[in-house]
Regions:
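Short beta-loop-alpha junction of Rossmann-like oxidoreductase domains
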Residues: 130-132, 181-183, 187, 285
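C-terminal substrate-binding subdomain of Rossmann-fold SDR/epimerase-dehydratase oxidoreductases
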Residues: 28, 196-325
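Hydrophobic alpha-helix immediately C-terminal to the catalytic Tyr-X-X-X-Lys motif of short-chain
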Residues: 154, 158, 162, 192, ...
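N-terminal Rossmann-like NAD(P)+-binding domain of SDR-like oxidoreductases, especially those catalyzing
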Residues: 1-178, 310-311, 325
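Structural element of the ATP-grasp superfamily
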Residues: 109, 159, 192, 285-287
Length: 325
């Protein structure tokens, strides 16, 4: 990705799971990277510790118009907009936070933020919701089933509208479920891994619902690949493997790979309301451009389990910064 060398890039959500991996990759490619973080939050972020001296930190609250206006005199080649409230289940309890973090932040950035040449909007597969046609195609009408999905879709639409009005170069990306090192334990894969490593009882639904899970390096590869290939598109682009797995099989794989003695109680829990039974990416477009995942699901899962084995005692420490991921 030599095209990124010396490019001035702003990453929102750069202290988050996907964002921090993106920032590290951009630094590796010798881009001039700035990261927006909430006030006084960077000191508590273990994800960026190793590259603090190689990035520029901008403290701002993207939900606050006046705060964003303070960046108006800055100029960047790209904004990678990843900042979001991104917990699907909890989004039902925190609707206003979803609106503020997922929608208002986008509106503020596009209307009051830095001068930019290109805006890369990081969406989500949750925009699709329940669909009749599998795998999910960007041509199908979105049907989000959570406040998270609704607000991320609205954010995408606002970005498209702004692009049409101002001729701003835009990419709207829809990555499917992602996993890897440094992910919050609120996500299903690290949650199950940590329970397996402690040999705790694991209670799940029947696990018939299917999801595809993409190793983080593959998603970052896809994001940067498509940004390099396509200057502008108001049509969203899926990033995913097109290889779904039933949740019950996922749990059993983690249990096996971690050599856990945890008791599995599959079928113990009820399905959540508005359960999405199948999520699978139609990835024909990005594959047709020459991208494909480099790391298989099973290898990525083993790498991730090994990482959590190294750090799980840190996760268990109530005072650990990892608890804030």
């Amino acid at each position: 990705m030599n095209n990124l060398k010396n490019k001035k890039i702003l990453v929102t959500g750069g202290a988050g799971f996907i964002g921090s991996h993106l920032v590290k990759r951009l630094v590796e490619y010798k881009a001039r990277v700035s990261v927006v973080v909430k006030y006084n939050s960077i000191i508590d972020c273990p994800r960026l510790v190793k590259i603090w001296d190689k990035i520029n930190i901008i403290e701002a609250d993207l939900r606050n118009t006046d705060s964003v206006r303070e960046m108006n005199n800055l100029r960047f080649d790209y904004i990678f907009h990843l900042a979001a409230y991104n917990h699907v289940g909890d989004s039902f309890k925190h609707i206003y936070e979803n609106v503020n973090s997922n929608l208002l932040s986008t509106i503020n950035l596009l209307n009051h933020g830095p001068k930019i040449k290109k805006f890369i909007h990081m969406g989500t597969s949750e925009i699709y919701g329940i669909q009749k046609k599998i795998p999910f195609d960007v041509k199908e009408k979105p049907n989000p089933m959570s406040p998270y999905g609704v607000t991320k879709y609205a954010s995408e639409l606002i970005s498209i509208l702004k692009s049409k009005q101002t001729k701003l170069d835009l990419l709207c990306l829809r990555p499917f479920n992602t996993f890897g090192p440094y992910q919050s334990e609120k996500a299903i894969i690290p949650e199950i891994i940590l329970k397996c490593l402690q040999n705790k009882e694991i209670k799940t639904t029947e696990g018939k619902q299917t999801r595809e899970f993409n190793y983080i390096d593959n998603i970052i590869d896809g994001l940067l690949f498509i940004n390099n290939k396509i200057k502008h598109s108001i049509d969203p682009i899926n990033i995913g493997s097109n290889k779904p797995i039933p949740i019950k099989n996922l749990v059993r794989k983690i249990h096996s790979y971690s050599r856990s003695s945890s008791k599995l109680k599959i079928g113990y829990l009820k399905y959540r309301p508005n359960e999405i039974w199948k999520m699978q990416a139609n990835n024909k477009f990005i594959v047709s451009k020459g991208w494909k995942p480099k790391i298989s699901f099973d290898l990525g899962l083993k790498i991730t389990i090994n990482w959590y084995q190294d750090f799980y005692k840190t996760y268990l420490n109530k005072n650990s910064l990892f608890k804030k991921l």
